Design a protein with these regions (language model features):
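Phosphate-/nucleic-acid-contacting segments
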Residues: 363
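Active-site donor-binding acidic/aromatic loop of nucleotide-activated sugar
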Residues: 422-426
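Helical hairpin unit composed of two closely spaced alpha helices linked by a short loop
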Residues: 370-392, 396, 401
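Catalytic-core elements of nucleic-acid end-processing and repair enzymes
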Residues: 433
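N-terminal localization/anchoring segments of enzymes in phospholipid and broader phosphate metabolism
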Residues: 1-351, 355, 359, 383, ...
Length: 512
């Protein structure tokens, strides 16, 4: 036989779950379309009811205290499709998670607010602008800023992976992992081997993975297998196509915490393309950040809040605090990890990005795989370039989603005319999500510049202020630019049909 029986069984398990889910989703979509057209065909009262629903949704959005760009694009969509617009918003645009999820998560977060209290003196050495940004995150996150912390920036997944394995091998107390995508392969096999051994040694090993993000990557008995190995698991927000088509509120975070002393974040998931063991869209360019010291506590609390909302295990987080030597670690500027979620109306991630852009005096360089933003972000980038700031946007040269890439390119002309320099990473797909500005501030994390990351998903990131790795990120961007193609105005020309398609994509951007 060419394939061993276990390989065949594994392949069948993955395909079976994926195929069943896809079939159920298609069945539900078909049923909903049939029901919509059947109910609305010649049914004046049904049409009137849908119009009234759209009217109420419109009034609700006008009064709702949330990002104006997000509201406006939904108001336009509802105005153009009054029969369907209100229902689409309820299905795909409503940022509030399901009531049960919201109640569980908010209860845990309220219980542990004191665990994230800002300690005095952490930001005293910062300039006023940096101190103000840090204060915003600590008050509205709330995630405190920390001295006594160090960081290491990785310009790609294959640079990070050996250090990650080495840190996992050192674990003595606990290992927490939280990822959007976990997929079987070389990367996961290396991690899993260590997790199984550590769990057998009595280390507390826990894994949260997004059920939708990992749908095609894991066998249906994955949780059972992990639990047998004493690795506790939570598939976050399980996919239930016959219950809901909504794919919002995904756990897009990337977090590893080892013993409360070391943490990782960035754009890298646990799948082979992230360390270039598998080629999907050319070379996979990503970024990650390793943190040591007091700042790791923020990541620990982020993880435990998610964990205890769905699998209550402990009320006291104190046993998971960094050890004494970590709390007294060498200081390298200020590090402030933070999370963003759809549980509140605070657009934390977008506000941090806007602050960095608006405060920039010399330069701001941005890595992002997707660019689908509102007028506020667009105008901030244009205004920075117009006042003489060197604004550079680095995007993929080989996209993973063709329509999203076309949507991204629809923003090129206004940005280019304002003086923003745009680059496409020609060797492959750029998946990093990073900002760096003025040798002063940087962010590295999981947050894309699109509606889903900024408003609908659970995300995480780390802000670096006057940290040595700000320069490391800047240098990585400058090394990457020669590998890119700089976009010129002539590259942005399109036909009338293309312009119309771009307009439609802009209108539908919250759904993409």
């Amino acid at each position: 036989m060419f394939f061993r029986l276990p390989v065949v069984r594994f392949f069948n398990r993955v395909i079976n779950r994926a195929m069943v889910t896809v079939a159920l989703v298609l069945l539900q979509i078909g049923w909903l379309l049939w029901a919509f057209f059947s109910l609305t065909a010649g049914k004046v009262w049904v049409n009137a009811g849908l119009n009234v629903l759209s009217l109420f949704i419109t009034l609700y959005l006008v009064r709702k205290d949330e990002n104006s760009d997000y509201k406006i694009i939904w108001l336009v969509l509802i105005g153009m499709m009054p029969l369907l617009g209100g229902a689409l918003y309820l299905a795909f645009g409503n940022k509030a998670p399901a009531k049960r999820m919201r109640q569980r998560m908010q209860a845990v977060e309220r219980q542990h607010t004191a665990d994230l209290a800002q300690q005095p003196g952490q930001t005293d050495a910062l300039d006023p602008a940096s101190r103000g940004l840090s204060r915003y995150i600590s008050e509205y996150g709330p995630y405190p800023a920390w001295k006594n912390s160090t960081a290491k920036y990785y310009p790609c997944g294959e640079a990070m992976y050996p250090d990650l394995l080495a840190d996992l091998e050192k674990a003595e107390r606990f290992i927490f992992l939280e990822f959007f995508i976990v997929r079987t392969g070389k990367m996961w096999d290396g991690v899993e081997d260590i997790l199984v051994r550590k769990a057998a040694q009595g280390v507390d090993v826990r894994l949260i993975y997004d059920d939708f993000g990992s749908l095609l990557g894991l066998p249906s008995d994955f949780v059972v297998k992990m639990e047998r190995a004493h690795i506790r698991c939570i598939p976050f927000n399980p996919v239930m196509p016959l219950v809901s088509l909504v794919m919002n509120h995904r756990d897009h975070r990337k977090i590893v915490v080892v013993d409360g002393n070391t943490a990782y974040t960035g754009g890298i998931n646990l799948a082979d393309e992230y360390i270039n063991e598998e080629e999907r869209f050319g070379y996979w360019k990503d970024a990650a950040l390793r943190t040591e010291g007091a700042a790791v506590w923020n990541f620990t609390v982020m993880f435990l809040d998610h964990w205890n909302a769905f699998r209550p295990s402990e009320e006291d987080y104190a046993p998971f605090m960094p050890q004494a030597e970590a709390l007294s670690a060498q200081s390298d500027g200020v590090i402030q990890p933070y999370g963003d979620s759809p549980l509140d109306e605070e657009a934390l991630a977008e506000t941090v990005y806007l602050n960095i852009i608006n405060q920039a005096q010399r330069y701001v360089y941005i890595y992002t795989p997707y660019f689908a933003v509102g007028e506020t972000m667009l105008e901030a980038l244009k205004a920075a370039a117009k006042r003489g700031v060197d604004v550079r946007l680095v995007l993929p040269g080989i996209p993973d989603k063709k329509l999203v890439f076309r949507l991204t390119r629809s923003y090129y002309v206004p940005l280019f005319r304002a003086g923003v320099r745009i680059y496409e990473f020609t060797p492959g797909f750029l998946h990093a999500k990073c900002y760096v500005s003025d040798d002063r501030a940087a962010v590295v994390g999981s947050i894309n510049m699109d509606y889903r990351s900024l408003f609908l998903h659970f995300e995480c990131e780390a802000l670096l202020l006057y940290n040595s790795q700000v320069i490391a990120l800047r240098d990585d961007v400058l090394r990457t630019l020669p590998e890119c193609r700089e976009v010129q105005l002539a590259d942005c020309r399109t036909s009338l049909a293309g312009t119309l398609l771009d307009s439609v994509l802009r209108l539908l951007s919250p759904l993409m």
